[in-house]
């Protein structure tokens, strides 16, 4: 399988993880235990705690007003239990560190999920983007959003915070084919570009959030239910990196909506086409598609049944062909004088043919 997939590991990213079950102070202590630093209480409107890592990068624990707060026993709790972990700008090699931080927060009592109005936001560096690659990015999301929302298990409780691509914006984007990022910005804000300065612009609540791109030069994938499973978070980040790499390297991505009667198979094919193939991404693929319905090996499951029946018929036919010569030899042996040595069965017997293994070609 060929493709330009090296960029998956070359892009920078950041993650915001919302949770509750512990206080911001406790979360900061848990993060500091991993990073080897000391929590520094900054305060401010987000009641922020900062922790520096060995590279002097700032990991922050901040307040988020949207979180439904509970304590470690699941009882309603104060706003001190509204926790959002904000990473610094990270590189692919930092993935194990991110996972250790996540595990530490969970071990300290962190809980999360749609029932707490919590989510995960993955930010990808926008520096390499041009107008064409930004258009590609939007088209990828538009064409694969049905896949993504099922793969990432977007809860209906959170859909107001991660809406699908605005179809009016999508239509204008592909009809006008803007040549500059500034032109795309005007389309995104429907002409009101002053919104770029409003942190809580209503345009930010999209699964593919370009408000973040125009304001901070990084685009945001919001279509993730929150989790404190380190492997799942790694899968979310890698998926966002792979989508971004496709947007940056492909000449054109179609906005045509992908549909499938076998979502498990189609999602796997799409992930492999994004470059998430091989042993390195095995767990990533597993986390993203294991809960989907369908047959992972066959686009049309009925073909698998036909294939098994065909192979069974071939094995039966092969056995009959091997048995028949032996019968003929035995009949001939009855008419042969005793002094002529009788052929051994091993001269006629053959090994049974092994069942053919089929692999899906991509």
PLM regions: where:
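C-terminal accessory/tail domains of diverse enzymes
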Residues: 1-114, 127-362
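Short, conserved phosphate-binding/catalytic loop or strand-edge motifs used
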Residues: 116-124
């Amino acid at each position: 399988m060929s493709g330009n997939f090296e960029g998956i590991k070359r892009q920078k990213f950041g993650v915001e993880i919302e949770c509750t079950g512990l206080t911001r102070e406790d979360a900061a202590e848990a993060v500091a235990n991993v990073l080897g630093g000391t929590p520094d209480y900054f305060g401010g409107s987000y009641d922020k705690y900062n922790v520096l890592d060995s590279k002097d990068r700032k990991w922050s624990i901040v307040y988020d007003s949207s979180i439904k707060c509970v304590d470690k026993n699941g009882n309603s709790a104060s706003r001190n239990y509204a926790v959002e972990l904000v990473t610094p700008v990270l590189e692919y090699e930092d993935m194990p560190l991110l996972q250790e931080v996540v595990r530490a927060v969970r071990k300290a009592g962190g809980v999360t999920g749609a029932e707490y109005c919590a989510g995960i936001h993955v930010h990808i560096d926008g520096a390499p983007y041009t107008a064409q690659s930004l258009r590609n990015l939007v088209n990828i999301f538009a064409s694969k959003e049905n896949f993504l929302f099922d793969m990432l298990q977007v809860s209906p409780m959170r859909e107001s915070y991660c809406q699908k691509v605005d179809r009016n914006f999508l239509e204008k984007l592909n009809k006008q084919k803007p040549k500059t990022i500034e032109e795309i910005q005007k389309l995104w804000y429907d002409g009101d570009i002053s919104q770029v300065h409003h942190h809580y612009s209503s345009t930010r609540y999209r699964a593919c959030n370009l408000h973040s791109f125009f304001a901070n030069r990084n685009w945001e994938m919001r279509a993730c239910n929150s989790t404190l499973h380190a492997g799942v978070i790694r899968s979310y980040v890698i998926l966002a990196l792979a989508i971004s790499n496709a947007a940056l390297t492909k000449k054109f991505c179609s906005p045509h909506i992908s549909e499938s009667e076998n979502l498990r198979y189609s999602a796997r094919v799409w992930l492999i086409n994004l470059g998430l193939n091989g042993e390195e991404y095995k767990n990533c693929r597993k986390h993203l598609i294991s809960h989907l319905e369908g047959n992972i090996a066959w686009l049309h499951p009925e073909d698998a049944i036909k294939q098994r029946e065909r192979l069974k018929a071939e094995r039966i036919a092969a056995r009959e062909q091997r048995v028949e010569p032996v019968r003929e030899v035995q009949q001939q042996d009855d008419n042969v004088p005793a002094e002529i040595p009788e052929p051994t069965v091993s001269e006629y017997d053959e090994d049974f043919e092994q069942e053919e293994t089929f692999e899906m070609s991509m």
